[in-house]
């Protein structure tokens, strides 16, 4: 490909439905965004967390943001299950008691292949998407779910 000046990115652009084309697409082209994804604050109650995590297109995860809307954590259904097993009064807790701090993230301009690799390596189902080229690189712009990426394999 490179001998003729035809790059992998050109291939992805001209063959977007092919296996290689799908794997080379950018995260921003397939991520869930805006009203499809739940975000909560550190002091959100467990009851509200559960409601949000089941009310959005992205189910089973919620990003945790601070007052500036910067990402500070994530709560997944696995985090909730582990928390419930250890606590006899879980409904007195809030998001910051449950969340995974410094969650794995991916840049909006990264290829799908990188997200698949990161998720498989870390055994996670959801990545929060950041736009690291923006003026606010810690503000989440979307989420990508492993199940959605399986169609790119």
Model feature map: region roles:
Residues 2-32:
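Internal, active-site/partner-interface "lid" segment
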Residues 23-37, 92-103:
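Bateman (tandem CBS) regulatory domains
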Residues 30, 53, 69, 98, ...:
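Terminal peptide-recognition signature
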Residues 30-69, 76:
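Oxyanion-binding "anion nests"
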Residues 37, 71-72, 81, 135, ...:
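Short hydrophobic beta-strand segments in globular cytosolic domains
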Residues 40-58, 84-87, 105-133, 143, ...:
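The conserved cystathionine-beta-synthase
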Residues 61-110, 114-117:
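Helical hairpin unit composed of two closely spaced alpha helices linked by a short loop
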Residues 73-78, 141-149:
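Short hydrophobic beta-strand motif reused across regulatory alpha/beta modules
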